């Protein structure tokens, strides 16, 4: 325990906002610069979108191999063969094959488009879906939109009874697009302990207080390496799952843009 304390004290000196360490279901170390203050977790949001997709598939709203263009009115008339072969799994694995990443970072603030769904479907697909990894916010965004259209509840409202209530997390603040859809690729705000519950749920393969909240099979599939991700700028990353990063040594993580991490170690 003294080593944990020393480690946390070292991290505090370099200016981190918070850290929690959980082992065997118990918190063994925690620091929060501002107690319980929620902060933007950026792309960690994607892993919550992954969980929402798991619930949606289990409830029969769509399937992993459902064709994306058949699920959106904006795409019905698209004739491009690559667009028409694109499946839900390609949105989850960052293998849509778009010509360029879109809806990234600060570019959303200056984007003149008000209809982001139509904007996505106007993009060129230059690689066969499923063949090339390209980190892109378009896929997670479409997944959040799809769930809202299928259920008439936005991503937060959809996850509240299925996930947040179970974990005793008050509904999270989120980023919204101009049309009122929760941005499924970034913007969720939570504190360290709330994020820790999410990681613990995944470590426990979807079980919480004796209840199977999320499919064990879905967690296994979404956190294992589905695709290679090339020369990612983290030497511990060795692949990508369904909106989760797979790490060397049987571990995985949700990862935000500015040093936000939720790392799950199975050992």
Predicted feature residues:
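Solvent-exposed loop and edge beta-strand segments that line ligand/cofactor-binding
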Residues: 37, 41, 79-82, 128-135, ...
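Active-site helix/loop module of the DD-peptidase/beta-lactamase fold
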Residues: 60-94, 98, 122, 150-190
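A small/polar active-site loop signature that marks catalytic segments
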Residues: 98-176
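Active-site-proximal alpha-helical segments within enzyme catalytic domains
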Residues: 142-146, 186-207, 260-267
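Active-site Gly/Thr loop motif
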Residues: 220-266
């Amino acid at each position: 325990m003294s080593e944990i304390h020393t480690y946390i004290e070292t991290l505090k000196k370099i200016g981190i906002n918070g850290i929690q360490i959980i082992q065997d279901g118990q918190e063994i170390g925690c620091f929060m610069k501002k107690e319980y203050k929620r902060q933007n977790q950026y792309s960690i949001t994607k892993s919550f979108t992954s969980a929402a997709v798991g619930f949606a598939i289990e409830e029969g709203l769509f399937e992993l191999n459902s064709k994306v263009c058949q699920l959106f009115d904006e795409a019905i008339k698209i004739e491009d063969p690559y667009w028409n072969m694109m499946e839900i799994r390609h949105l989850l694995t960052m293998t849509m094959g778009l010509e360029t990443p879109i809806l990234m970072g600060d570019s959303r603030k200056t984007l003149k488009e008000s209809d982001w769904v139509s904007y996505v479907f106007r993009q060129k697909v230059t690689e066969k879906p499923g063949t090339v990894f390209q980190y892109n916010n378009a896929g997670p965004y479409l997944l959040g939109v799809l769930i809202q259209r299928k259920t008439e509840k936005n991503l937060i409202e959809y996850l509240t009874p299925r996930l947040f209530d179970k974990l005793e997390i008050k509904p999270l603040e989120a980023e919204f697009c101009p049309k009122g859809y929760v941005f499924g690729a970034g913007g969720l705000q939570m504190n360290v302990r709330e994020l820790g519950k999410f990681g613990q749920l995944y470590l426990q393969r979807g079980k919480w207080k004796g209840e199977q909240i999320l499919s064990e099979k879905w967690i296994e599939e979404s956190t294992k390496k589905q695709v290679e991700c090339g020369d990612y700028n983290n030497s511990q990353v060795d692949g990508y799952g369904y909106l989760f990063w797979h790490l060397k040594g049987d571990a995985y993580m949700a990862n935000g843009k500015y040093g936000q991490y939720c790392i799950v170690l199975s050992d």
